[in-house]
Amino acid sequence: MKKNLFKTYAFAAVVALVGMSLTSCGGGSSSDSDVSDIPTDGILGDLPMLTAKYCDQVVDLREKMFSDQLSEDEQKKAKAEFDQLREEQKAKMLLGRNALDGKEIPVEVQDGVPMKVEGTLKIDGNTQGSLNAIGTGEYTEGMSMKNYTNYVIVPIDKDGKAIETKSRGGLFGTLDGVGALDGKPGEKVKITAFVSGVGVDGANSKKANDMKRWAKLAKYVIMDKTTDAYKQLDEQLKAEKKQEELDAAKKVAGE
């Protein structure tokens, strides 16, 4: 009885640990060839590739752990593998983030958005959690809560496509101070752009394709999400992701 209880609790503990990682990675796996296709010469260096590879490894480990035939020794081995993988990933990501500290990312403001930006955004590689790029903006005319909620920070790749269009409440970053109802021309705004999927603890993306997009990060654009330009980027990204899901399903089905 004690042995059965131990086995049950041991399995539950390992599942919980992997589950925490899979909350970030999400379901599904990408092939090794997909990971090898991810470029490492962009603004974010090898972090997107390392993230995608980590996701693959965690998903593979999960599949092994959920095998119908899993002995007590295999449970312990799987947990040890996961612990080692997690620590190795932390070290790799920490080194990669530190190497990016201070690196500049261009930022633009869409015509019609009442703001200007001073210089570029700079990566803060010394923070825990999300990797951020920080900069300073300025109102060019009065701001209200009504139009503030329309403005989003969109990461754009080298081909002019959106990498993501919605995250964290609709923003891929924050415009601190823009929410003030009495925003005045000349008032300073702190701009914080989030780089998704490359945290110290590893991946927050479930697909190598997501990391392929981040690997091609070229700039951020502050946009009005009610404009046709934003809506076009959003629809294009949705179509691209839908096609990727169909391609993955065909691959699993052997087509």
Which role does the model predict for each range below?
Residues 62-78:
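Charged, low-complexity interaction regions
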Residues 26-28:
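Bacterial signal peptide processing site
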Residues 111-149:
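Short, surface-exposed binding/anchoring microloops in extracellular/periplasmic proteins
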Residues 20-24:
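C-terminal motif of bacterial Sec signal peptides marking the signal peptidase cleavage site
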Residues 81-125, 229-248:
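Transition segment at domain starts
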Residues 47-60:
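Short amphipathic alpha-helical heptad-repeat segments
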Residues 2-12:
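Bacterial N-terminal signal peptides that target proteins for export
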Residues 159-217, 224-228:
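Short, solvent-exposed, Trp/other aromatic-anchored flexible loops in extracytoplasmic proteins
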